[in-house]
Amino acid sequence: MALRHFLTLRDLSSLELNSILDRASELKRQQHANQVYQPFKGKVLGMIFEKSSTRTRISFEAGICQFGGSAIFLSPRDTQLGRGEPIEDSARVISSMLDIVMIRTFGHNIVERFASFSKVPVINGLTDDHHPCQLLADLQTYQEHRGSIKGKTVAWIGDGNNMCNSYMEAAHMMGFKLKVGSPKGYEPKPEFLAEFAHCVEVFNSAEDAAVNADLIVTDVWASMGQEEEQKLREKAFLTFQVNEALMALAHPECLFMHCLPAHRGEEISENMLDHKNSVVWDEAENRLHAQKALMEFLLNENAKRA
Ligand code: CP
Ligand code: NVA
């Protein structure tokens, strides 16, 4: 049996994805009821962060601790990863001492190379191309508030970035329609779009994408690693703010999500996070529960191989 990783959403089947989402809500109920559940005593998660993080780091670390295991935070600044030790060598060594590894980095090929030399499951905690863990939380949150997302319409407003790519995969796997509203030149890359013509439509207007949507999602205009483009992007994205007026074009029950951190006054209006249909705080909390369900799935799959 092959070693299972989670580098993009499509490393799971639709069936597995749905069962992880249901399990996430079940683990959430248990956690809220203060039930102790420690199936992974002695298991160690390694967390490699080449970019900053609040939610991803805390949710993974808290999650493995709640399961009875522990986590090691590894930054390139303090390890040999930052001094040029090859990914392949690092992967062999690091994975020989750990039970599961999470990586947040730049190029998606870095997590792929790490995974291909790893002896244990590898989770993508965000690359320049994908943020699949965030999608687990977003899908869980939609399901908890509105039921099945199948057949619904989701509007992605803003940059055709890593989050947008993961939304395209989710649309394909979960059976919803994705309307992407991006400024010219900032649409998702053609190589990602190519596969998803059946479920993704691109507009160069936020309004056209938002009409009748059941969920509106946005993200920062300049992602980590694009800080130098901030000023240029502020101009290009000026008419792509999610605000009360944009929400008014959508379905009355339309939810609002943002992976956070958010920039009030840029991609969202000052009060958007507090909009009556905003579920951003549940979305952030669900990172914990969704990733616990993911780690449980991967650790159990790996145990079956032994
Ligand atoms: N949404 C998200 O991944 O947040 P962090 O960058 O804080 O981990
Ligand atoms: N697109 C953003 C997401 C942050 C969680 C980034 O890559 O910086």
Curated annotation (Swiss-Prot):
Q: Which reaction does it catalyse?
A: carbamoyl phosphate + L-ornithine = L-citrulline + phosphate + H(+)
Q: Which organism is it from?
A: Acinetobacter baylyi (strain ATCC 33305 / BD413 / ADP1)
Q: Where in the cell is it found?
A: Cytoplasm
Record's InterPro entries? Asp/Orn_carbamoyltranf_P-bd, Asp/Orn_carbamoylTrfase, Asp/Orn_carbamoylTrfase_sf, Asp_carbamoyltransf_Asp/Orn-bd, Orn/put_carbamltrans, OTCase_ArgI
- EC number assigned by the record: 2.1.3.3
Supply the alphabetized keyword list: Amino-acid biosynthesis, Arginine biosynthesis, Cytoplasm, Transferase
Query: Can you name this protein?
Result: Ornithine carbamoyltransferase
Xref: PROSITE patterns: CARBAMOYLTRANSFERASE
Q: Name one GO molecular function term.
A: amino acid binding
Q: A single GO CC term, please?
A: cytoplasm
What residues bind carbamoyl phosphate, as annotated? S53, T54, R55, T56, Q80, R104, H131, P132, C133, Q134, C259, L260, R287
Top-rank taxon of the source lineage equals Bacteria
Which GO annotations describe the biological process of this protein?
Answer: arginine biosynthetic process via ornithine; citrulline biosynthetic process; L-arginine biosynthetic process
The metabolic or biological pathway listed in the UniProt record of this protein is:
Amino-acid biosynthesis; L-arginine biosynthesis; L-arginine from L-ornithine and carbamoyl phosphate: step 1/3
Which positions in this protein are listed as binding L-ornithine? N162, D219, S223, M224
Keyword Protease recorded? no
Q: Does the keyword Cell membrane apply?
A: no
Function, as annotated? Reversibly catalyzes the transfer of the carbamoyl group from carbamoyl phosphate (CP) to the N(epsilon) atom of ornithine (ORN) to produce L-citrulline.
Family per similarity comment = Belongs to the aspartate/ornithine carbamoyltransferase superfamily. OTCase family.
Q: Which gene specifies this protein's sequence?
A: argF
